[in-house]
Amino acid sequence: MTDMNILDLFLKASLLVKLIMLILIGFSIASWAIIIQRTRILNAAAREAEAFEDKFWSGIELSRLYQESQGKRDNLTGSEQIFYSGFKEFVRLHRANSHAPEAVVEGASRAMRISMNRELENLETHIPFLGTVGSISPYIGLFGTVWGIMHAFIALGAVKQATLQMVAPGIAEALIATAIGLFAAIPAVMAYNRLNQRVNKLELNYDNFMEEFTAILHRQAFTVSESNKG
């Protein structure tokens, strides 16, 4: 027993316990791939949001900023995508010249809200999987452990004289399943909470930007309306 390592325990485990271990290892690999990918995407989203908002508040004209965004409209993300969607709808409704200022601003705000929801949906891709892994992996591992221990005691019942050396390898094989389940679950739960926290922070950032931009469009719409009346 002292010479056994984890690989030996895996190879000597029953077929079902081996299958459970492989499933949990697969969950762990998939979780780490998602953690790395989502972390990179959220880091990029935070940088892009900060860079665009710095540019937005630099005093640049909205029409010029819109033209710049229009030139790369297929690659827009985050705050810039929200801005582009809102200003595009604002310009379209304003040119129609058949809508009250309130309707123009409301239409632009609605377009920005839809765009923001799409951005958040993209940011949240695959994150729920981490929550699922964190929830079910310990139970899958526990099932493997229970099955392995049961299998070990059944085998033990077939011998006349039972000793600790006979049952210990079987129990150790079974407990490996629980260990792998925890190994898969703990990072997944921690990453799930952390990534959701970052998505919520970006959502608040987008929402604040949208409210501020809506206020600017509101002033602009009523200014143009008053000048047309005059």
From Swiss-Prot:
One Pfam family hit: MotA_ExbB
Assembly and interaction partners: The Tol-Pal system is composed of five core proteins: the inner membrane proteins TolA, TolQ and TolR, the periplasmic protein TolB and the outer membrane protein Pal. They form a network linking the inner and outer membranes and the peptidoglycan layer. TolQ interacts with the N-terminal domain of TolA and with TolR.
Topological domains annotated Cytoplasmic: 37-138, 192-230
Family matches, as NCBIfam families: PRK10801.1 (NF008066), tolQ (TIGR02796)
Keyword Aminoacyl-tRNA synthetase: no
Highest taxon of the lineage: Bacteria
Location within or outside the cell: Cell inner membrane
GO biological process, one term: protein import
UniProt source species: Escherichia coli (strain K12)
Segments crossing the lipid bilayer: 16-36, 139-159, 171-191
Periplasmic side: 1-15, 160-170
Membrane topology: Multi-pass membrane protein
Role, per record: Part of the Tol-Pal system, which plays a role in outer membrane invagination during cell division and is important for maintaining outer membrane integrity. Required, with TolR, for the proton motive force-dependent activation of TolA and for TolA-Pal interaction. The Tol-Pal system is also required for polar localization of chemoreceptors clusters. The system also appears to be required for the activity of several outer membrane-localized enzymes with cell wall remodeling activity.
Phenotype caused by lack of the gene: Mutants lacking the tol-pal cluster suffer delayed outer membrane invagination and contain large outer membrane blebs at constriction sites and cell poles. Tol-pal mutants fail to complete division and form cell chains, and fail to process denuded peptidoglycans at the septum.
GO cellular component annotations of the record: cell division site; cell envelope; membrane; plasma membrane
Gene this protein is translated from: tolQ
Name of this chain's protein: Tol-Pal system protein TolQ
Similarity-based family: Belongs to the ExbB/TolQ family.
Coiled coil: none
Keywords attached to this entry: Cell cycle, Cell division, Cell inner membrane, Cell membrane, Membrane, Transmembrane, Transmembrane helix
InterPro entries assigned: ExbB/TolQ_transport (IPR050790), MotA_ExbB_proton_chnl (IPR002898), Tol-Pal_TolQ (IPR014163)
Annotated disulfide bonds: none
